[in-house]
Amino acid sequence: MVHVRAKDAVGQYGERVAVRRLTEAGMTVLDRNWRCRSGEIDVVARDGDCLVVCEVKTRRSVSAGTALEAVTPQKLARLRRLTGEWLAAHPGVNPPRVRLDVVAVTVPERGPATVQHVAGVS
């Protein structure tokens, strides 16, 4: 039997919600949870001719700050480096534009999750 920590389950749920939001917005998901030695990219998608690298942050409440506040300048710098590594690992992908997005998901104890998609955060 595989045991999933509650925090991990919330994060996985948030990523599923985020992917649904991105696809409903017309994007095509190219990769999920891509990992390399330097870290992980939550979602890589295509929005027209633009490659979108998306950080997903999920919170149960805003008591420790919002999900968007958790995306620091250091996190964005790391995401930019990871984007370069993803592109190097996928030589057939040569987008004319690359954009970093954040999808913030808040999962309350009751009721539906709230989702905020911020395009072009860096």
UniProtKB/Swiss-Prot annotation:
GO terms for molecular function: nucleic acid binding. InterPro entries: Restrct_endonuc-II-like, tRNA_endonuc-like_dom_sf, UPF0102_YraN-like. It comes from the Bacteria. Pfam families: UPF0102 (PF02021). Belongs to the UPF0102 family. This is UPF0102 protein Krad_1407. It comes from Kineococcus radiotolerans (strain ATCC BAA-149 / DSM 14245 / SRS30216).
